[in-house]
Amino acid sequence: MSEKTFLVEIGTEELPPKALRSLAESFAANFTAELDNAGLAHGNVEWFAAPRRLALKVANLAESQPDREVEKRGPAIAQAFDAEGKPSKAAEGWARGCGITVDQAERLKTDKGEWLLYRAHVKGESTEALVPNMVATSLAKLPIPKLMRWGASDVHFVRPVHTVTLLLGDKVIPATILGIQSDRVIRGHRFMGEPEFTIDNADQYPQILLERGKVIADYEARKAKIKADAEEAARKIGGNADLSESLLEEVASLVEWPVVLTAKFEEKFLAVPAEALVYTMKGDQKYFPVYDNAGKLLPNFIFVANIESKDPTQIISGNEKVVRPRLADAEFFFNTDRKKRLEDHLPRLQTVLFQQQLGTLRDKTDRIQALAGWIAGQIGADVNHATRAGLLSKCDLMTNMVFEFTDTQGVMGMHYARHDGEAEDVAVALNEQYQPRFAGDDLPSNPVACALAIADKMDTLAGIFGIGQHPKGDKDPFALRRAALGVLRIIVEKNLNLDLQTLTEEAARLYGDKLTNANVVDDVIDFMLGRFRAWYQDEGYTVDTIQAVLARRPTRPADFDARMKAVSHFRTLEEASALAAANKRVSNILAKATEPLNDIVHASVLKEAAEIELARHLVVLRDKLQPYFADGRYQEALIELAALRAPVDEFFENVMVNAEEKDIRINRLTLLSKLRELFLQVADISLLQ
């Protein structure tokens, strides 16, 4: 069967830069699935993405599906014909579905009986006939939150479409995709190269687009070029470029032909906190800031143009003129804000609503102040500093700088607090209260900051759950999932002695009578334990390990973590599988027991050697392990419990649990319950697979 290279390129208006990669990857994944489902043999499926195009190139695509033999078994002969030998309705219906008559059907004989059988040789469809619908289906499944319609057409897509190139080798596959007739025409760069040209063969892509159209269609190659050129440009001025992955991705999605240039701004602006300047450069202008080797911001920035200019100084000058007013604004706001102390902004917090049922930002501040102080007392942080940090926590939201540059919240609070002479751990806490902002983000660095960060997040969790507005589906307007995971990470990774039960109760208590959900504490704890499940799955723990610990519902996050590590280690022991199975057996036996058990195992009632030996082991281990459980030394405890494998195996091998004599039966059930209780001090290992 012959094979050829296949190319599809969808030429569009400028695609959303933050979605470009996901659109291209989804297009490739969807189309690959279509090929596989159709049984079309193919090689590598390569995706390309630039601001005005999505493309796929498939190596060694078969020109048709393979022929195949089809067999359809019909009714058994006994049901296929009546007593007179006439076909039954069931047989006739089956035959019609196969496109034959009953007398054309074959017979299938086996040891189990005889059936009607239809056999056919089905010729594979051509790739040319299959591909158009496969492309259309793949595009329809793209993750596009909001579709556009353009002109008088009813066609919807993420952006208006201008060209559709569909080639199998050197042949155009005729089709209408997104309202456009397929062709071999490709559009180049808007301002360089050939604006439009034809491609003779799919193998020429993407090189022909690079040479004639001045477009680097390879997304990763374009991104790598920007990174390498920006690093070199920074080195030339003695600095290091801040090439954050997210901004690199966005810039790579904005340009077709990247040209890296270096510009500068006035040194006087360096008196403004670097975070505000960087916010403007990265967030508004998509520039890369440059730092010296000591990490200090330099009065330079690197940007990426989408054109090769005969006079790049004009482009540089233009970008410098664009950024200067924004930096001047930041300077003005910074100088104006410092004329007031942070504390002076407290009254204005009363004018900003946190949530209609939960009050204003001033109300939230009062709660955070009290809760941060309470948490500080629990974890050994400075209570006065934590309370002070809570009082000032939202004041920077009322400053000119944060109002204009919203992403500087927290960090500007830190700078203004330092200017006001606040304690350093208070100032740092104002910045770190929002950490961790995302997965893998840094945690608050000092105990006061930890107390404030936990207080802020727990206040939101208790309040929103307290009025019954918990997250539903993908909707989470108050970022409660992030808040819950942030609290858990801080407590676990900082090894803080905090209990979710008392923590949530205190957070809810501070709302007074504003909360309407009587189950708010349990709801918040269940929600947070659910985030634990997601966290540990991401960390690579198995679902049954997580379930085994969750079954005990530990509400101290640091304790939960210790149990997780203990059970995970226990699974590596040779005895683990047998003991998990034994615990499952014990659990099932106890679940079926209807008689009340004894408080203790009565040694005088023990008869068999195996039950006497098991009881002896349990007594020894119970006394030995109590300090382990009290100190949270769960891994050591489970290692000790692994020694029970032999006596447990002996017990089930030689002892009849449900003995006829009631006192013996109840004593043996009590013995098993004591065995299970020991393991349940750590986790329900009966859930381990």
From Swiss-Prot:
One of its GO terms (cellular component) is cytosol. GO terms for molecular function: arginine-tRNA ligase activity; ATP binding; glycine-tRNA ligase activity. One of its GO terms (biological process) is glycyl-tRNA aminoacylation. PROSITE patterns: AA_TRNA_LIGASE_II_GLYAB (PS50861). Disulfide bonds: none annotated. Its EC number is 6.1.1.14. It is found in: Cytoplasm. It catalyses: tRNA(Gly) + glycine + ATP = glycyl-tRNA(Gly) + AMP + diphosphate. SUPFAM superfamilies: HD-domain/PDEase-like. Keywords: Aminoacyl-tRNA synthetase, ATP-binding, Cytoplasm, Ligase, Nucleotide-binding, Protein biosynthesis. Pfam families: DALR_1 (PF05746), tRNA_synt_2f (PF02092). Its main location: cytoplasm. Belongs to the class-II aminoacyl-tRNA synthetase family. Tetramer of two alpha and two beta subunits. This is Glycine--tRNA ligase beta subunit. It comes from Salmonella schwarzengrund (strain CVM19633).
